């Protein structure tokens, strides 16, 4: 990552620097202390570090796709100086294929999914790994059950793809989710 990209992140309106010591230039750690949920934190990083996303809304990852779509529609320019691209196909399987296609063109691609959506895109995930494509699959981990759908936390999404060949990084909190997201690119 170049120095100009790092400067853009910290000078962006996304990270307004307010508080004691800012006016005097005595900020020890640049950035903002803010309370946001995990989806918001991930999108703050993704929309700066990625070029394109293919996603189909599924709870609890729906917000990430919505926030990305809003940023793309508003003409947001990422740190590479590129406008964001968003594709919302007809299902999760197609979303994985779209994301793979975006990665094949050389774009920094991302996908947002969880639960049954991960299970549905399973075949496409193996194909992406087989082609050695690099993209980030942001998972809002949730449990999958046989009897009813639920949105309770769980690691079933992880176990669904643990043998697919994806590197999987787990965050213990919201800050770690943002940090690991940028590291994964």
Annotate each language-model stretch with its function.
Residues 151-185:
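Conserved thiamine diphosphate
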Residues 2-160, 165:
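Thiamine diphosphate
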């Amino acid at each position: 990552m170049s120095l100009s990209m790092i400067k853009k992140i910290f000078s962006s309106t996304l990270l307004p620097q307010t508080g004691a010591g800012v006016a005097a230039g005595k900020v020890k750690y640049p950035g903002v202390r803010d309370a946001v949920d995990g989806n918001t934190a991930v999108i703050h990083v993704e929309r700066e570090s990625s070029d394109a996303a293919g996603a189909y809304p599924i709870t609890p990852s729906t917000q990430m796709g919505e926030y990305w779509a809003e940023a793309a529609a508003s003409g947001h320019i990422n740190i590479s100086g590129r406008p964001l691209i968003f594709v919302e196909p007809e299902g999760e399987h197609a979303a994985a294929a779209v994301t793979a296609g975006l990665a094949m063109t050389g774009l920094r691609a991302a996908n947002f999914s969880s639960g049954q959506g991960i299970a549905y895109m399973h075949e496409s995930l193996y194909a992406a790994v087989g082609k050695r494509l690099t993209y980030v699959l942001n998972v809002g981990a949730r449990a999958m059950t046989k009897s009813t759908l639920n949105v309770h936390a769980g690691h079933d999404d992880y176990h669904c793809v643990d043998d697919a060949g994806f590197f999987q990084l787990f965050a213990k909190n919201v800050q770690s989710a943002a940090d690991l997201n940028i590291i994964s690119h």
